[in-house]
Amino acid sequence: MQSRIDKLCEKMHDNEAVFISSYPNIFYYSGFTSEDAYLLISHSGKYIITDSRYTIQAREQAKGFEVIDIAKGFEKIFSRIDEKYIGFEESYMSVAENKRIRAKLKDGQDFVEMQNLINKPREIKDECEIKKIAEAEKIGDMAFEYILGRIKEGVTEREIAFDLEFFMKKQGATALSFDTISASGIRSAMPHGIATDKKIENGDFLTLDFGCVFEGYCSDMTRTVVVGKANDKQKEIYNTVLKAQTTAIDAIKAGMKCSEVDGVARKIITDAGYGENFGHSLGHSVGIEIHENPSFSPKNNAVVQNGNVITVEPGIYIDGFGGVRIEDLIVVQNGKAVNLTSSPKELIEI
């Protein structure tokens, strides 16, 4: 954790400190696993502010941080540091909380927005983070192999989702990355079709988008299968998405613009006549949170870097017919994409 703090402090001016209120950044910089805390990081000291329920836990997890009981020491916490500008995370703090924290500043100090500075180091995953994400993705791969044996005509979307989630937790997942997407038939045209009591029917597409959390880090993958035999149009759509996905993964190189990676997949889908049916970005970074930066989007000119962990998930969605999405999770290492997802991608007919 100290190396992460050192990198953060290198980006801060001598008269700047940061006050962190979001769980993802509290966990990233301290290792503390409760949401009931704040961090104050300056050039001269590190403080974790929490209540009496968590002070022992904070001492055990947040090594190198001075633990401050929120009931006793919070009122004068900013008097412990000399920095003038205290950075906060705009997206994670309500107006009311911001006002309450500002009232605790000492004379001459100012509360300023520094969310990008605080978040930026998380874009490049270290070896320990990559291992945890890879383990979470491995659990997802095992879950997909398991669920293939449970999918059949007459089973509901919700039953499939529940089975997936229960299996992942049995394998060591501590939570889900997000609500499992289980969408069949014409509902598969909804990119975020949350599971319902709809029964799976013969001839349906079934799209499953799921992930789990392992030691604080998320996984994410999507597979689309056909229940029964695929018709010609289903095969055409599926193979178009598969070509777009595999070609984009092969094209990823450190130094490329994220928009260029998106463009590789988008061109294939557009050339096949389905450009208007691919409405979302190609992918997003994954880490402590399921959606992080950078993303593979048409408008993102950020550069791909070694250590980025990003999804590649093109899709085609046709209202009234159904949809296909195929998603892998990749890490950029030695200048190219390394796939963390091992589940098969050829069209599966069940």
What are the functions of these language-model segments?
Residues 1-350:
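Active-site neighborhoods and metal-handling regions in enzymes and metal-associated proteins
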